[in-house]
Amino acid sequence: MKPNIIFVLLDGSRFDRIHISPEFCDLIKQGTLLDNVTTAIPYTFGAINVILTGEYGKENGVDGFYKVSKLKKQVSFLPEILQNEGYFTSRGLIRDEILSPRGFDFRKEYNEYEEDLNLRHPELIKDTIEKSKGKPFF
């Protein structure tokens, strides 16, 4: 059986501060924490594309703040790879255009000023579990 994958990206968070949240500490105990990482590009939109393609922005097409939507079609993209392997894929972002829709079965956009940040991610996971209908999910 394929494992479910929950990828959490904390934007602007320092490693020495993540242990403040009891919920996040529980998540760390049950999963894998990468505690020695360096960003490949100094802004979130580019960095998430580097993580999900395995290629620097120069190669994947997202090499500038205003090039978020320029992910090259020929570049392998983790959500597509997992989708092709039978995973149900979903994501939740503050703006849909931050990341290519390629390979995502379900996308949710949030208003960071109006929604409770402590509730939105558990709701996304619950929605993902329901929509995945027994398939492994990412």
Q: Model segments located where?
A:
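Active-site-proximal alpha/beta segments of enzymes that process anionic O-linked groups
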Residues: 2, 14-138
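Short, hydrophobic/glycine-enriched beta-strand segments
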Residues: 4-11
